[in-house]
């Protein structure tokens, strides 16, 4: 018996880690970085704020970072849209920071420019008449300016894109 291995139980500092995330979108008017009051009262924004408050108060949770990712719809000059997305990320961060005053959390704002990937996803999921043609244009051209021009040439469809798809891409994603 003397040669038998044995185990000693000792205290440890193991803490179970779980990652939880919440999301919300703040939408903007075309060419504007101004956060409208009605956007901050939307249910998804209120739920996001409640999520942050609840998790920041929990003893078993270490709060991460609240990211404000600014995007622009892919209509208009690319340089303008890059600056606009940066302004949107900053205004979205400022707005959510004001609503979450007193909560110890880090913030990070980043600009992502024109959201062609989001555009592709929304078009693919839509019931727009010429969606296959639009998706083909996206795969044929790498240039943002060329993509935009070719899609605008589909004038009947472009009006539908302006009302159904593009407004969803003008956002700060939290």
Placement of each model-derived feature along the sequence:
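Extracytoplasmic/periplasmic, Sec-exported soluble proteins
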Residues: 16-20, 36-40, 58-60, 76, ...
